[in-house]
């Protein structure tokens, strides 16, 4: 396929794509160009770029992450890790910068990872977190908030399927319905990586 392929739901190119695919989901055997969508997948070869929430290929490592920290103490996520780039989709509970009632969050992070020594790597990512405050809502705390976050991570892979990591970062928690920050501060996290 040469040129531009646009669809509302999915694009499928069984052979080589030379150009651009734009849809919610994109698939091509070989890509010479750009895939833009929520989920992008190529099977054999990429000479170009994928721009989406999840970018995958046969070599993508799909890893489960379990972690906690000073902002949300209980989190679980799925990381789609390629050679250099990765994305993380996660959920967490008990957002700590509210009162003590139940709250939950959903997050998306995208970043770069660099190996520095046998099993040791550093990475950095930018993220967005949606926070549902549930019963915490009052005159000061709205029903929903969002956070913009930056993190630096240090990860050590103990075995091929098990690793540990520590994270430091900074986040701004903001209102959806008005300008200004609800809160801001440091992020400290640690956890494990499976698979």
Regions found by a protein language model. Give the residues of each.
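Outer membrane beta-barrel transmembrane domains
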Residues: 125-149, 153
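Residues that define the transmembrane beta-barrel architecture of outer-membrane proteins
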Residues: 18, 30-32, 47, 68-74, ...
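Long amphipathic alpha-helical protein-interaction segments
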Residues: 44, 48-49, 53-82
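Sequence/structural signature of outer-membrane beta-barrel proteins
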Residues: 11-13, 27, 41, 58-60, ...
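Repeated loop/turn-to-beta-strand initiation elements of outer-membrane beta-barrel proteins
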Residues: 16-18, 32-34, 46, 83-87, ...
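Long, low-hydrophobicity, solvent-exposed regions enriched in small/turn-prone and acidic residues
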Residues: 1-4, 18-19, 33, 103-118, ...
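Repetitive, compositionally biased segments used for assembly/scaffolding
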Residues: 1-60
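Residues on the lipid-exposed face of transmembrane beta-strands in outer-membrane beta-barrel proteins
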Residues: 24, 38, 53, 74-80, ...
């Amino acid at each position: 396929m040469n040129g531009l392929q646009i669809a509302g739901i999915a694009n499928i190119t069984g052979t080589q794509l030379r150009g651009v695919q734009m849809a919610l989901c994109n698939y091509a055997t070989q890509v010479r160009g750009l895939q833009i969508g929520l989920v992008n997948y190529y099977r054999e070869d990429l000479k170009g770029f994928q721009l989406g929430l999840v970018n995958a290929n046969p070599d993508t490592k799909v890893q489960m992450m379990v972690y906690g920290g000073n902002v949300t103490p209980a989190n679980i996520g799925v990381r789609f890790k390629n050679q250099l780039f990765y994305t993380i989709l996660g959920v967490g509970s008990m957002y700590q910068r509210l009162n003590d009632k139940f709250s939950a969050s959903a997050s998306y992070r995208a970043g770069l990872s660099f190996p520095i020594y046998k099993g040791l790597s550093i990475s950095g990512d930018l993220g967005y977190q949606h926070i549902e405050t549930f019963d915490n809502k009052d005159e000061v705390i709205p029903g929903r908030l969002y956070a913009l976050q930056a993190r630096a991570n240090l990860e050590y892979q103990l075995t091929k399927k098990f690793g540990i990591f520590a994270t430091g970062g900074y986040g701004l928690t903001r209102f959806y319905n008005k300008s200004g920050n609800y809160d801001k501060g440091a992020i400290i996290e640690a956890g494990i990586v499976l698979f």
